[in-house]
């Protein structure tokens, strides 16, 4: 029987080949065939991929992202003869749960998830439970262009070594934006943001964790409020959480009464706070995409006077990745798709403010001149004016306990 897509799949039948890894022998026994593992020439991988169908599991909450994936589907179809179906997720954990269940049921090949857009705690879970195919990423032909020096999070996912088990796809960093006419002097630290909220009650908020940017807001505060961050980059322990999070809860206890609806309610999604900003309900808003304000200006949802900034002492940032589950039956098609996503052409289109505006993982100085020219060099209104240093994410094991403690304290 053919594999069936899970609910919420889109553009079905388009012709194209999205938080310790397996050993080479283990992956082989579980049904994968990888260039990295077998030494097979890339042309052979492409030939085997032709005619395969790939179920790509990726967050489906953005029209821009969905449209980009549809474009990529068409391109890979035309060039490589592989099919893809975008399985739209509301939470990446859905796909992780599905792969885990298949492994428990003994389904060691022909799984229902072929590619997953992933990082952080979800990657950590899949790596620890040997749910990932590979290593494969650093043997993809287009990996040669990845900026592994200037963007070290391309090899470290929430402080967990990637080890070739997922391929970097895009960059993210905690960013704020506001209308310069209303906020001429932006708050450039979490302490300054609290002062701003006190001076402008009801005009600041953040999404309710576990919404991603809400959790990122917690991590930014956690990192800024701890001068010794060493414990945050080690696997979570209850004792470490109690020590490190004490200043965070004190900060939030003082901040919440000055937030939107006095901190008794929180928006559910990033889209909700974007709309509140567009409506003038908020004076400052948060994002994990440094180009979001520019996107909003181009889409005529924000005024040209909107500008973006990051925290002066550094903003938490990471890379998001594409991974292949251990039990895919179409490893060749999955690798062809991911390799295309790493191409200068696909990365430049993804970085285009008018298309998506997701920052590239590539190093401009590694690209031939023609490919480098595809990336816009002129800054646009709303783009971050003075990018801050990246603060590495805490270890991925901190995310769930941090969210649970927030919900226990503030989620009622």
Labelled PLM ranges:
Residues 1-16, 23-30:
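N-terminal secretory signal peptides
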Residues 39-121:
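Early extracytoplasmic/lumenal segment of secretory-pathway proteins
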Residues 41, 275, 382-412:
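Conserved C-terminal helix/tail region of periplasmic/extracytoplasmic solute-binding proteins
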Residues 51-54, 82, 111-114, 200-203, ...:
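Loop/turn elements at helix/coil->beta-strand transitions in domains of secreted/extracellular proteins
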Residues 59-71, 87-94, 113-271:
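Extracytoplasmic ligand-binding site segments that recognize negatively charged/polar headgroups
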Residues 260-323, 327, 366-374:
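Extracytoplasmic/periplasmic substrate-binding proteins
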Residues 315, 320-386:
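Mature extracytoplasmic/periplasmic domains
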